[in-house]
Regions:
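A compositional/biophysical signature of low hydrophobicity enriched in polar/charged and small residues
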Residues: 1-160
């Protein structure tokens, strides 16, 4: 069982895999699918939550169906790396509703944002707000032509 998170057993992995695929399942349904009693499953789910492994529960929304058809991966390079600049930039980006993922990355670029907008005009409005008040060395947008694989559950049995 849990204790040390490196000691996840097959039941813990089954619970996590099941919930990654469908977090709307009832506790009873999860227990049945992983082959445990409801009480034992509940205790393990509580332990996984307490350990910070099992976090939240979200429904996936098809943003394109809502008119947010353009997905852009925005890469940013800057020479500013002082903590106060990074904190200010981070707060700024987190207040831009078009940004659905935000990463500080290693390599040639410093930041990667995943952005959704209703179209090119929406992206231009977003871009103007993004750069307002900040100096960057380079900003580039990579436009997604097709979603081939998105939000795939991690194959925990093969990864751990």
């Amino acid at each position: 069982m849990i204790g040390n998170m490196k000691n996840l057993d097959i039941f813990d992995l089954r619970i996590l895999t099941t919930l990654q695929r469908d977090s709307s399942l009832s506790q009873r349904q999860v227990a049945d699918l992983v082959g445990m009693s409801q009480n034992a499953c509940w205790r393990r789910m509580q332990a996984l939550q307490a350990a910070g492994i099992l976090v939240g529960s979200q429904a996936r929304v098809d943003l394109a169906a809502l008119g947010l058809e353009l997905t852009i991966f925005v890469m940013i390079r800057t020479r500013h790396h002082a903590r106060d600049w990074v904190d200010r930039f981070s707060r700024h980006v987190q207040n831009l509703p078009e940004v659905i993922d935000f990463h500080r990355i290693g390599g040639e670029w410093d930041y990667l944002l995943k952005v959704v907008t209703p179209g090119m005009a929406g992206y231009d409005r977003f871009y103007q707000r993004l750069i307002d008040g900040f100096e960057f060395d380079k900003v580039t947008g990579l436009f997604s032509m097709e979603r081939i694989l998105e939000n795939r559950p991690a194959d925990l049995n093969r990864l751990l």
